[in-house]
UniProtKB/Swiss-Prot annotation, chain A:
Name recorded for this polypeptide: Molybdopterin synthase catalytic subunit
Assigned keywords, A-Z: Cytoplasm, Molybdenum cofactor biosynthesis, Transferase
GO cellular component, one term: polytene chromosome
Keyword Cytoplasm: yes
Binding site for substrate: H101, R102, K117, K124, K125, E126
PANTHER family: MOLYBDOPTERIN SYNTHASE RELATED
Subcellular localization: Cytoplasm
Note: This protein is produced by a bicistronic gene which also produces the small subunit (Mocs2A).
Assembly description: Heterotetramer; composed of 2 small (Mocs2A) and 2 large (Mocs2B) subunits.
High-level lineage: Eukaryota, Metazoa, Ecdysozoa, Arthropoda, Hexapoda
Originating species: Drosophila yakuba
UniProtKB/Swiss-Prot annotation, chain B:
This protein's GO CC annotations: cytosol; molybdopterin adenylyltransferase complex; molybdopterin synthase complex
Subcellular location: Cytoplasm
GO BP terms in the entry: Mo-molybdopterin cofactor biosynthetic process
Annotated metabolic or biological route of this protein: Cofactor biosynthesis; molybdopterin biosynthesis
SUPFAM superfamilies in UniProt: MoaD/ThiS
Post-translational modification comment from the UniProt entry: C-terminal thiocarboxylation occurs in 2 steps, it is first acyl-adenylated (-COAMP) via the hesA/moeB/thiF part of MOCS3, then thiocarboxylated (-COSH) via the rhodanese domain of MOCS3.
Superkingdom of origin: Eukaryota
InterPro entries linked to this entry: Beta-grasp_dom_sf, MOCS2A, MOCS2A_euk, Mopterin_synth/thiamin_S_b, ThiS/MoaD-like
Sequence positions bearing Glycyl adenylate: G90
Species of the source: Drosophila yakuba (Fruit fly)
NCBIfam families attached to this UniProt entry: moaD (TIGR01682)
Protein name: Molybdopterin synthase sulfur carrier subunit
Any one GO molecular function term: molybdopterin synthase activity
Length: 367, 90
């Protein structure tokens, strides 16, 4: 039998037990919801309950029929809810069920209180001690409007949803309030930052042992490894990384020529130290270096600007070594193969040849 | 509102926070015989000053919740509408 009631007086638990009693039942389960005396540090004096009586009873009866369809073995069901002012620590709701075996009784009561909090139109207001304003409570389970009721009528704009829910894994829909969203974004940014930081450390400090690893995605220009040795605090081995994509590469690199000019305070081609010196210097040695470094040379150029060019090249090579040859695009090199030496080939006539042979013969005869 | 189509007189009940905002437990209102739930909600919210809780309200028509706001509601004379703020029973 179903016992559904809204009551204005204290609920008598003994009476509930009488309602549940049945000779064929081995289990009766009783849930008693009582009023707490505190909320967020505020002392609760009492609670005021109100209900949409007729609808509340209707919903409570619906819960009973739901329970019976889910657990057909249930014998008696009791749902009592108290209304009006309820002092703290008194029962505001009692849900009870009896059944031949315990599992139905226990599960159904648990299900019923969840349903009651979700569907039954009853409200409570907490009245606090002191100057705090009383507050209408809200069950987290409470039935709520499904859509956000903004001025825009979403319902009027049907949205076609693809049958297959193949949402890219990278996309996530999040429905939260602004504060929560801000918090999550902050967490995300912080985590990304940490990730990048740790990656940077890995970039710089990776083991030589795993040198077969591909570092082409690393932004680091150097790799280092700590090699522990006895009697030593630290041994850091550094090697350079061939990285064509790194921000320091190529275009982004400082203009060494300009920097060096600044350092030397020289204006290219304008300072012209002693011409004797230029002439006296054997240019061949410099030329050899220049050609080795793929520099176009001009013997008439100021010797200092030529040396400077070599220095620039050295700096550049240092910054990109050792594989510089693969990606330094330079002016066409002056390393064309030297013109072949013209060796005049002498041609002999038949008479000359026979005379020559005769000469050898005669000579052999003389000796 | 009442300009086009027939209208019916409907009872409106207020509870908890909505009762305090509307300053009355019950009222009567003239409504068209057919209206979408979202329009109905807008109408009631503006008529009874329920704006502070409009996003948390749910309506009950003749003691049944209106779950879907795009639903078309048909009214008869003397129907009962309830303004239901979030529940807190138990």
């Amino acid at each position: 039998m179903d016992h559904v009631k809204l009551v204005n007086d204290p609920i008598d638990i003994a009476h509930i037990h009488q309602l549940l009693a049945d000779e064929g039942c081995g289990a009766s389960s009783v849930f008693v919801g009582t009023t707490r005396d505190n909320f967020q540090g505020k002392k609760v004096v009492s609670l005021a309950y109100e209900a949409y009586d007729s609808m509340a009873l209707k919903e409570m009866n619906k819960i009973c029929s739901d329970l019976r369809s889910k657990w057909p073995d249930l014998k008696h069901i009791v749902i009592y809810h108290r209304l009006g002012t309820v002092p703290v620590c008194e029962a505001s709701v009692v849900i009870a069920a009896s059944s031949p075996h315990r599992s139905e009784a226990l599960e159904s009561v648990s299900f019923a209180i969840d349903q009651l909090k979700t569907r039954v139109p009853i409200w409570k207001k907490e009245i606090y001690e002191g100057d705090y304003d009383s507050e209408w409570k809200e069950n987290k389970e409470s039935i709520r409007p499904k859509k956000s009721q903004s001025a825009f009528n979403y319902a009027a704009c049907p949205c076609k949803v693809e049958e297959s829910h193949d949402v890219p894994r990278t996309l996530v829909q999040i429905r939260v309030n602004d504060a929560e969203l801000t918090k999550r974004l902050e967490c995300f940014v912080n985590r990304k930052r940490d990730e990048i930081n740790s990656q940077n450390v890995i970039d710089f400090k990776s083991s030589f042992v795993n040198s077969d690893k591909d570092f082409s995605d690393s932004c680091a220009r150097t790799q280092s490894t700590i090699i522990k040795q006895e009697q030593s605090n630290s041994h850091l081995k550094v090697r350079r990384v061939n990285n064509r994509c790194g921000p320091q590469q190529m275009e982004m690199r400082p203009n060494y020529e300009l920097e060096l000019n600044k350092l030397m305070g020289s204006r290219d081609g304008q300072t012209d130290p002693s011409k004797e010196m230029r002439k006296s210097l054997p240019n061949s040695r410099l030329q050899a270096i220049e050609s080795y470094m793929c520099l176009t040379t001009d013997n008439e150029e100021n010797i200092f600007s030529r040396i400077k060019k070599v220095e620039n090249r050295l700096l550049q090579l240092e910054s990109i070594s050792p594989e510089y040859r693969h990606f330094t695009k330079l002016e066409p090199s002056s390393m064309e193969p030297p013109p072949p030496k013209k060796i005049r080939k002498k041609s002999y006539s038949a008479q000359e040849l026979s005379a020559f042979i005769q000469k050898i013969k005669d000579g052999s005869e003389f000796t | 509102m009442n300009a086009d189509g027939p209208v019916v007189n409907v009872h409106v009940l207020f509870f908890a926070k909505s009762r305090e905002l509307a300053n009355t437990p019950r009222s009567k209102v003239d409504l068209p015989t057919e209206i979408t739930a979202s329009d109905l909600l807008e109408l009631l919210v503006s008529k009874f000053g329920l704006t502070p809780i409009r996003d948390n309200l749910i309506l009950a028509h003749n003691e049944s919740y209106i779950d879907n706001l795009s639903e078309r509601i048909l009214f008869k004379e003397g129907d009962e509408l309830a303004i239901i703020p979030p529940l807190s029973g138990g």
